[in-house]
């Protein structure tokens, strides 16, 4: 009996896939089909997969072509599978020609002609075509444009900014460049807002009432009441309102949270997060987006692991700011301490003070160490009393997390299902703390 094996993601199964499976089956007597796992797709940068692993496996099974279906979960598995299943022929699409020649040491390799004019990528693009506009003056606004090129079905068509003269070249070359938000809203289906946090509520509300989906740099309001009202409005009108905190969508950070919540380090007693930069010179302070202070730029990012691991029901907090008196929103250094019934947390953020940008999560059995810059990590460690027990975890990170954030947003819009990695109670808590930072008379100030 001649055994044949082939692999694929098989997202949005189409006649091109079916033709390839039929040709592979004709090469032998028994066909094994390997369907890629979601984590494996993410690890190799394939982030636009629409369907779940279970759906994709079921679609392949329903064709009746495969004799056996397995899951591809890791790099190098093809060699293991060929040996384990006694494979005679490895078959794959011709667009991979030459890529798998090394497998000829283990079995015959056959490259099959692809069906022209059809692909999962084109189907995803047709289904999810979303015209998106950018709003704001942030120095990193162009990162959204650059990373959107890797997201099927998303097209950045314009930008609304008060500083057209200082736009990055890529933004300045967009079809629509304006200082009129209404002009931008008329041309798009959704907006990404990256502006001064003091402007977020008005801009988000404006966009939602214009019927647009919104991805907004956190927080999207400065009080829980305003934040909850925006989330309720979006839900009632079938619109997506999503926090833009890139770290939440990175694979390494997400897996870290799952391990900690699963008790890998015992009970969490302390979370300490630090985010700082000195990249802004005094001259840069004149540029809008560079003068929001450490809290405006880093606050929600540093608070994210605290709220996701310890919750939002802290019993007390202290906010300390170092910055020009009377301009708390331009504070160059901020430290916030939170006390919970059974834990504590601390965060430091700064645009004028430098410190090690690490994340440390202390537990009763072990601790998690994430080296700088932890907010865009692809690696972390779980460290125990006995160093021999330490574990290291590595995960691919594409586009600093922006890319994963954008694909999650597109999927939420296209499916109508909320799938943000940031829960509503955390969004509300971020609004609360950021509002206290800007407005609370109890903020302590140091020189």
Task: Describe each model-derived feature in a short phrase.
Residues 134, 183, 190-193, 228, ...:
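C-terminal helix-rich "cap/oligomerization" subdomain common to oxidoreductases
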Residues 247-319, 326:
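Predominantly a Rossmann-like dinucleotide-binding segment in NAD(P)-dependent oxidoreductases
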